[in-house]
Amino acid sequence: MASGYLRYPDIHDDLVVFTADDDLWLVPVTGGRASRVTTDHVPVRNPRFSPSGTRIAWTSYLAQRPEVYVLDLASGQQHRLTWLGARKLLTIGWLDEDHIVFCSPHQTNDVGLMWLYTVSLDGQIERLEYGPGMDLAISPEGDIATVTPNSGDCSKWKRYRGGTAGQIWLRAAGQDEFTRLLRDGEDHDGIDVEAGRYGVGWIDGRLIFSSDMGAVLPDNPTEQAQLWSVNAHGADLRQHTHHSEEHGYVRDPRTDGTTIVYHAHGQLYVMDGLDAHSDQIDVELGIGAPAPVPVDPTDRLQSIASDFGGDGSLLEWRGAAYYLTHRSGPARALSADATARVRSPKALGNTGLGVWASDVTDDDCLEVAALDGSGYRDTGEPRRIAAGQLGMVLWLEPSPAGDKVAVVSHDGRVLIVSVESGQVRQVGRSAQGEATGLAWSPDGRYLVWRQARDGEDSCGAIFCWDEHGLGESFQLTKGTFDDSNPVFTADGKYLVVLSARTFDPHYDGQTFDLSFGHTIRPWLAPLSASEPSPFGPVPEGWRISEVQDAKAKALANAAGDSDHAPTVTCELDSDGFEERLVPFPVASGRYRSLAAVKDGVVWIEEADRGGELGAARAGVTGEAPADALVHYGFASRRIERIVEAVDTFAVSGDGERLIVRHKDEVSVVPSDHKVDAEDPAHVAVDLTRLRRRITPRDEWRQMFDENGRLMATHYWRDDMNGVDWEAVLRRYRPLVDRIHSVDDLYDILWETVGELN
């Protein structure tokens, strides 16, 4: 049994090269202790011995994108040979001692259309004459076999029989034309000729390859990819391996002309010839499980949500829930179980509690715990509610009082969960994709959201649920335009949405054409049909004293002299709601992330960073312009850019502060005016107080399990198309205990999900 997850072997005489732990290794074909020959610790693919066995070429992601590298075994020196920057590149083998064969789509506009090339040891690249392909094998006699390109071998597309399955084309020595191997209509008893075929090589005058063409549905769906061969004319098909489900798919067979190696389920196998039995190569890497590693504070810092007063924030950090005070103090781990993943932690109003979604119970649930780290009611553990009733939680939003939580499920349901009782109530359902933009009225009576009209990419309408109503949600806008991001103003008088209702075309700069670029504005509708719009002229004029009174009240609040805020009561007249919508007095643009703050609203104005390709800023020095945070005050009746650089932000529960994130910096600023970095009202949050060590395999096990739940939850048929999904997960889960990198995990996930084909 190998001590790791071993892949992509190649052989030369009695030496095998393979990949493990994101590096290249060498081991005798008889097995034993392996030697690491690279130390880059990046994903690597397809190591290939040169004909003399003195060099190894391979694909490495050391430069972020896959490129061809070569290693001299005598000196240990490695060199990068290509600088293509393509999304795909596969090292295939050696044309001769000085030229390496690879495939890449770098000269096409189709990432899936790879062509065959050679690169010399001095970096000269030439395209081969064989057309598109992802593999190439040339026999000593000059017979040529190529494989048509696609996204991967059959281990990722198990039992795939579509038009892009890899097919082998043969050209006999001395011939000019290629012929396709195993064509439709030919007599191949019990073989599905539409299956993909991969990993070609020549041995004893025969062409070997791997394929799952023995899996003929529905008779034997569990048949694995095996090693097959044909003669130089594409006839005399033979099967050479008989792997079961426990052994796995035969993958990436390679031969030096006398011996064959391949891998399956992270194990290496060797065959001394076509008629020999395949034996497992026992390899000892000499490395243990990946050690616990510290996590950077901004690594997978997914979300930041403020508490009520803006004194601290709940963070979703690498699958855990943390509470971090904004000005000094330690970070508190509220839920950091390595076997579970936490999502969307948020404060429950001014209760001192937080809530988040967690898969700790296998099915999603909500967890509730105190922000001081004492758990729920000093138990030291979070309280779990609604387990198994929520589906896969996509979004959640607590009510202002913290007594209810709105949840959007993967199946389109909009749910209300009582924090006290855990009771779940369905209040809406989006039949065309997920609902988004959950928002409560200040009194917690109304819940609004956006849902698509005809499909996830179509226009969206605003829906509302009234706690005092009959229980059914109702539609506020028709969805004729794309309405999104609804929010109630803090005074409970208005509902504001972002809506793409501006149709002011611009001429194209290259052709005689018109397009609609900036279509979005914030729009407002009074909840009450008798409430006037806050915009436009009024007979009495707009009072200056209102602004002065608002400033005086803000100063009194800051001094602690204010009385308790008056209770806000909302009353929504749904009839004629859309007819009451009026635009804010701002120019249409590209806006997102609308939110209500005290005495106003804020949103992000997206900067003009040029086109999709980046050519508009080619040669421009400095950073691209950043998105800005814009504030509109109802009392001042003016718009102001209060933060010049923002990626995301959160509003404190009282609406008085904003927690702003830009790149790796987080700061707290007032919600209604701009402050400099030196202003006492500007607080830079020290993220270095976030400290945590994670054990990689614990995370990888959680990722594997969550992926299994996601597939079961989202699969297009309830019966999983007859696949015993739990049995599949049980078969592949032990492989996670052998992996040493996240790239290994991705490989296992590809194989696991491929079982659903």
Give, region by region, the residue ranges found by the protein language model.
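Intrinsically disordered, Ser/Thr/Pro/Gly-rich linkers and terminal tails that flank
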Residues: V582, S593-A596, E605, L613-N757
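Beta-strand-rich domains and repeat architectures in extracellular enzymes and scaffolds
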Residues: M1-V27, D299-Y322, P585-A607, G611-E612
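Predominantly a core beta-strand signature of beta-propeller blades
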Residues: R33-R36, G76-H79, G123-R127, Q167, ...
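A short helix->beta-strand "capping" segment at the edge of beta-propeller domains
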Residues: M1-G4, A34, G286-L301, G380-P382, ...
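Blade-terminus and WD-like Trp-Asp/Gly-His loop motifs, strongest in beta-propeller folds
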Residues: D10-D13, P47-R55, T91-H99, A137-A145, ...
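A flexible loop/linker signature enriched in serine peptidases of the S9 family
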Residues: T19-W25, D40-V44, T59-Y69, T82-L89, ...
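Extended repeat-based solenoid scaffolds, especially LRR ectodomains
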Residues: A305-D311, V547-A587, A595
